[in-house]
Amino acid sequence: MGENKSGKVPHQRIVANGIEFDSKAEHDRYLELLVMERAGVIKNLECHPRWEIIPAQKIPGHRGFQAAHYTADFRYFRDGVEHVEDVKSSYTREAQDYVLRRKLMYLVHGIYVEEVVR
């Protein structure tokens, strides 16, 4: 796969079991988690769970702002503890919007997003 105009190698979206994954790495992690769920190691695997991290804002005399959300790659429970994961490359884990949203997840919901770097 060649580079695009920005010099980055584009990721390849994959659809499996009716679920769209942003990359092969995310799909591969899903397959790993499915095996773990079937083996009883984890429970309640969920793809692309979403949380509101900033509520919509109404500003008198203006349009206001829509709510901001964080969508993780996976959520599951292991030994009764909730785990939220995001699959990232070493490049995408540095994106400013991702870093901010990840921090807001912890601030607003008390949820630490675990990074799976591939």
Task: Please report, for each region that a protein language model flagged, where it lies by residue.
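Electrostatic, structured charged patches in enzyme active sites and in nucleic-acid/phosphate-binding
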Residues: M1-R118
